[in-house]
Amino acid sequence: MDPLEQPDQARWNARYATGDAPSFTPHPLAVAALGLGLPAGPVLDLACGPSGSALAAAEAGRRVTAVDVSDVALRLLAAEAARRGLGGLVSPVHGDLAVWRPAPASYALVLCTGYWDTAVFGAAAQATLPGGVLAWQAFTQAARLDRPQLPPDWCLRPGEPASLLPADYDVLVDKPTDRERGRMRQLLARRVAARSAD
């Protein structure tokens, strides 16, 4: 049995195998992050699904590591990357974010949209290069008013995720998304090389 075979993988595999074909439209947060003047280096897309954001980063010349628990989503992404001539830039990684961790200080951009786990966020913050950007969007507790089946731990608490950033980050954007009526919150933050001793 696949060591990752578990309820999350089965649920997402079923969704991607039977749902509509992915649009591969990049997430607006990814588009914003890619336009921020990133340092040299690769991009990490966490809980990526069949990610148009990973493709947009590759089209901008970035190497991309795209991690997801769904092997079906990763096959769709890999096929689209190959169709666009980007197969050499997009590296799908079949991983469960509950245990998979990126190397520290390795990525110019770390992106995650639609997933929340405080430990994963902490590892992502450490994986961002100095000068690089951490881009995150996740459900807030308010989302549970419409979707009570969402576990509380999958939703941001007040002040998160910005309140969990290490001290070597500057917050660029921290706001609820208009589209979700405050049911989601997004963050863009840049890791600085060093703080002055003022």
Predicted feature descriptions by range:
Residues 1-38, 41-49:
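Conserved class I S-adenosyl-L-methionine
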Residues 70-72:
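Conserved SAM/SAH-binding beta-strand->alpha-helix loop
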